[in-house]
C-alpha cells in the first residue's frame, strides 16, 4: 500500500489500525469471516473501473467481454456449487438480493410470512422498520416457548388462516437445522411460494453439512461472505421458471451496474468452496461450535434451544444479571469481539440493550483455532462476564488474548 500511504495517510492509517485490530482480537461474530488473499486481490482488481450494466452478452456498454467472462464463471460456479438451475450474482448485498426476490415473487400489499426478528429472524423478513414491513402485509411466525425451536404446527395454522403469497425462512440468530421439507409442504397447502435466505448457513449448505433448500424453494438468497468466506455481497438462486423475473428484479429494477470487482471475487470464492479443504473447514467449524456450546454450559450459562446444530450459539444472559450491551463492550475491551442479540421470549429487553449475546466460530476456525483454543476463549468469556467492568481483569485477559492471537495468522493478511 505504498501509494495509498503517500496519497492519503488518513485512510492508510485507518486500514493499518483495522489490520492490527484483526490480528490482535478473537472474532466470534457469527456473520463475520476472513477471505483468502485471492479473494482480496480479485476485489481490488482493475474490474473496479468497468461499468457493465446488463448481463453477459447483453450489456449496455462496450468493452465488457472480460466482464462477461468473469460473471459467467461466477454464475456457472454458483449453479454447480449449490446444484441450482439459475443464479444471479449481481446483488450488492444480501438485503438487496432479498429485495429483488420479493419484487420478483410477490407484489406490494401481498401477505407474506417471516420469522419474527426477536426470535432469530432478519430485518428483511418482515420487520416493521424495513422495506418488507412497509410494502407487504406481514404475518410473523415464531418459536415454541418450550423448545425454542420454530413452531411448525403454529406456522402451518397461521398459514392456513392468512393464506400468504410467500413464506420466508432463514435466520440471523437461529442455532438449529431448518426443516425445508416441512416449509415446502406448508407452502403447498396454501399455494404460497417459498423463499429461503441462507446467508448465514451458505457455507454449510455448500459443504453438504446442512440440508439444502434448493430442491424445495422457489427462490434462495444469500450473502457471499459469512460461512462462505467470500467478499461482501449477495446472490440469488432460483428455478429456471423464475430466472427472467429474478434477473429483471435485480437489473433494472433494483440496481444499475454490478460491482464487477466483487463479482470477480465471488467467482473466486465459489471456486474455493468447491475444494475438499472447504468441507474440512466447515466440519471443523461445526466441531468448534459444539465445543463452545459445551464449555458455555459448563459455565452455567443458558443457551437458547439448549444448544446448536450449526455455526452459532445464542446465549441468554438474563439469569446471571448481565445484559448483552454491557457484555459486548466488556468483551471487546478484553479483545473478544461478539455481538449483543435479542433472546426469544425475554422480558425487559430492547434491540440496543438485549438480554443475550450471539457467538459463532467461522472466523476463529478460519484462523486455525481448534477445540483447545475455543475452550480457552470461552474460559476468558466466563471470566469477563463474572467481572463486568473490572478493568484489571479486562487488561489481563486482553494480554492473554493478544498472546494467543500471535500464534494464529489472519487469512489473507498474514501471508
Curated annotation (Swiss-Prot):
Provide the site residues for: Plays an important role in substrate specificity: 225
Q: Which residues carry this modification: N6-(pyridoxal phosphate)lysine?
A: 226
Keyword flag Cytoplasm: yes
What SUPFAM superfamilies does UniProt report for this protein, alphabetically?
A: PLP-dependent transferases
Q: According to its UniProt record, in which pathway does this protein act?
A: One-carbon metabolism; tetrahydrofolate interconversion; Amino-acid biosynthesis; glycine biosynthesis; glycine from L-serine: step 1/1
Class of the enzyme per the UniProt entry, highest EC level: transferase
Cofactor entry? pyridoxal 5'-phosphate
Which CDD domains does this one have?
SHMT
BP-aspect Gene Ontology terms = glycine biosynthetic process from serine; tetrahydrofolate interconversion
Gene3D superfamilies in the record, alphabetically?
Aspartate Aminotransferase, domain 1 (3.90.1150.10), Type I PLP-dependent aspartate aminotransferase-like (Major domain) (3.40.640.10)
- Which cellular component terms (GO) are annotated to the entry? cytosol
Q: EC?
A: 2.1.2.1
Catalyses which reaction(s): (6R)-5,10-methylene-5,6,7,8-tetrahydrofolate + glycine + H2O = (6S)-5,6,7,8-tetrahydrofolate + L-serine
Main localization of the protein described in the UniProt heading: cytoplasm
UniProt keyword annotation of Cytoplasm present: yes
Q: Keywords, A to Z?
A: Amino-acid biosynthesis, Cytoplasm, One-carbon metabolism, Pyridoxal phosphate, Transferase
For molecular function, the Gene Ontology terms on record are:
glycine hydroxymethyltransferase activity; pyridoxal phosphate binding
Tell me the compartments it is located in: Cytoplasm
Identify one Pfam family in the record: SHMT
Report the family membership: Belongs to the SHMT family.
Quaternary arrangement and interactors, per the entry? Homodimer.
What does the UniProt function comment say about this protein? Catalyzes the reversible interconversion of serine and glycine with tetrahydrofolate (THF) serving as the one-carbon carrier. This reaction serves as the major source of one-carbon groups required for the biosynthesis of purines, thymidylate, methionine, and other important biomolecules. Also exhibits THF-independent aldolase activity toward beta-hydroxyamino acids, producing glycine and aldehydes, via a retro-aldol mechanism.
HAMAP family attached to this UniProt entry: SHMT
UniProt protein name: Serine hydroxymethyltransferase
The major lineage groups are: Bacteria, Bacillati, Chloroflexota, Dehalococcoidia, Dehalococcoidales
Amino acid at each position: 500500500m505504498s501509494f495509498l500511504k503517500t496519497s492519503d495517510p488518513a485512510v492508510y492509517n485507518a486500514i493499518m489500525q483495522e489490520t492490527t485490530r484483526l490480528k490482535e482480537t478473537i472474532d466470534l461474530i457469527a456473520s463475520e469471516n476472513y477471505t483468502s488473499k485471492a479473494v482480496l486481490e480479485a476485489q481490488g482488481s482493475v474490474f473496479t473501473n468497468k461499468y457493465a450494466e446488463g448481463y453477459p452478452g447483453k450489456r449496455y456498454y462496450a468493452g465488457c467481454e472480460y466482464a462477461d467472462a468473469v460473471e459467467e464463471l461466477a454464475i456457472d460456479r454458483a449453479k454447480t456449487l449449490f446444484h441450482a438451475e439459475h443464479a444471479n450474482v449481481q446483488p450488492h448485498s444480501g438485503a438487496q438480493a432479498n429485495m429483488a426476490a420479493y419484487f420478483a415473487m410477490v407484489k406490494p400489499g401481498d401477505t407474506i410470512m417471516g420469522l419474527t426478528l426477536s426470535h432469530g429472524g432478519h430485518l428483511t423478513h418482515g420487520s416493521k422498520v424495513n422495506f418488507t414491513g412497509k410494502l407487504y402485509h406481514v404475518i410473523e411466525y415464531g418459536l415454541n416457548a418450550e423448545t425454542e425451536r420454530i413452531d411448525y404446527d403454529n406456522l402451518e395454522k397461521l398459514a392456513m388462516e392468512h393464506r400468504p403469497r410467500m413464506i420466508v425462512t432463514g435466520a440471523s440468530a437461529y442455532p438449529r437445522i431448518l426443516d425445508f421439507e416441512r416449509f415446502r409442504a406448508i407452502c403447498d397447502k396454501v399455494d404460497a411460494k417459498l423463499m429461503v435466505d441462507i446467508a448465514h448457513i451458505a457455507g454449510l449448505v455448500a459443504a453438504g453439512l446442512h440440508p439444502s433448500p434448493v430442491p424445495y424453494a422457489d427462490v434462495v438468497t444469500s450473502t457471499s461472505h459469512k460461512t462462505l468466506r467470500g467478499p461482501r455481497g449477495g446472490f440469488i438462486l432460483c428455478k429456471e421458471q423464475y430466472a427472467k423475473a429474478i434477473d429483471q428484479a435485480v437489473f433494472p429494477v433494483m440496481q444499475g451496474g454490478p460491482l464487477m470487482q466483487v463479482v470477480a471475487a465471488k467467482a473466486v470464492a465459489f471456486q474455493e468452496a468447491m475444494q475438499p479443504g472447504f468441507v474440512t473447514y466447515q466440519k471443523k467449524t461445526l466441531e468448534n461450535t459444539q465445543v463452545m456450546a459445551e464449555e458455555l454450559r459448563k459455565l452455567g450459562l443458558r443457551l437458547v434451544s439448549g444448544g446448536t446444530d450449526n455455526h452459532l450459539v445464542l446465549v441468554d444472559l438474563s439469569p446471571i444479571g448481565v445484559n448483552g450491551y454491557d457484555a459486548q463492550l466488556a468483551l471487546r475491551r478484553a479483545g473478544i469481539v461478539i455481538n449483543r442479540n435479542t433472546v426469544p421470549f425475554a422480558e425487559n429487553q430492547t434491540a440496543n440493550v438485549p438480554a443475550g449475546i450471539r457467538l459463532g466460530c467461522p472466523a476463529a476456525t478460519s484462523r486455525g483455532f481448534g477445540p483447545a483454543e475455543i475452550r480457552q476463549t470461552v474460559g476468558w468469556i466466563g471470566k469477563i462476564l463474572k467481572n463486568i467492568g473490572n478493568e484489571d481483569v479486562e487488561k489481563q485477559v486482553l494480554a492473554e488474548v493478544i498472546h494467543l492471537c500471535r500464534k494464529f495468522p489472519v487469512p489473507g493478511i498474514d501471508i
